[in-house]
């Protein structure tokens, strides 16, 4: 692994106290960011990632940034650190809660932002987590992931004070499915979401 040692980001002492942070180069994958929660994805790293994403969002004239998450135990804490970083740039956070990735993608077409991130470890073991990032309804390329890393290394962040609010996007997602799918017959089904984020929306979708 290649590690970059960065001095504490100015103005972030209220979020964390270490004098420097360790940034594992291996968390920056081809199209997302992924690593072991609390080991690779530390408070300092995730906060700085939030600063980079918020700064990039504002640069693209997106003053609102959507954040969703999966059901992993580490996801609420990563959300807290990430959202604080985004807010510190003056970018607003739209919290859509625990949602599967398709609902997150739907949100970027139906809320006041086309950019955001879903916190998810995907198929990886329970101690992993990660970040799938969208800007302007597009998944980030490997070049964009590397640019985000460079922002963190250079501390190329905007400063400001954003606001956060929560919204339920699931109802909009349900309506989109209902308008697109017509069942010829009623169905009796059983669902096993395997502890995935779909568990919080599947019953609502099928009952509707």
List where the protein language model places each region:
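Aromatic (phenylalanine/tyrosine) cluster motif
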Residues: 3-7, 16, 20
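An N-terminal, well-structured beta->alpha segment
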Residues: 20-84, 88-89, 166-187
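Active-site flanking residues adjacent to catalytic metal/cofactor-binding acidic residues
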Residues: 31, 69, 120, 191-194
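Ferredoxin-reductase
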Residues: 54, 60-136
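Gly/Ser/Thr-enriched, mixed-charge loops and adjacent short helices
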Residues: 129-208
């Amino acid at each position: 692994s290649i590690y970059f040692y960065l001095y504490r980001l100015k103005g972030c002492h209220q979020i964390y106290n270490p004098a420097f942070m360790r940034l594992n180069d291996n968390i920056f994958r081809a199209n997302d960011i992924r690593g072991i929660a609390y080991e690779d994805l530390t408070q300092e790293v995730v906060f700085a990632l939030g600063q980079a994403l918020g700064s990039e969002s504002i640069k693209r004239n997106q003053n609102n940034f959507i954040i969703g998450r999966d059901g992993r135990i580490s996801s609420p804490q990563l959300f807290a650190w990430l959202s604080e970083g985004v807010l510190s740039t003056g970018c607003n956070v739209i919290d859509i809660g625990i949602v599967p990735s398709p609902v997150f993608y739907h949100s970027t077409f139906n809320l006041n932002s086309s950019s955001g991130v879903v916190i998810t470890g995907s198929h990886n073991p329970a101690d992993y987590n990660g970040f799938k990032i969208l800007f302007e309804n597009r998944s980030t390329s490997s070049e964009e992931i590397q640019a985000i890393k460079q922002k963190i290394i250079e501390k190329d962040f905007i400063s400001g004070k954003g606001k956060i609010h929560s919204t339920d996007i699931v109802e909009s997602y349900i309506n989109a499915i209902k308008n697109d799918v017509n069942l010829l017959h009623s169905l009796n089904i059983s669902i096993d979401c395997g502890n995935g984020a779909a568990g919080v929306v599947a019953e609502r979708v099928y009952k509707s």
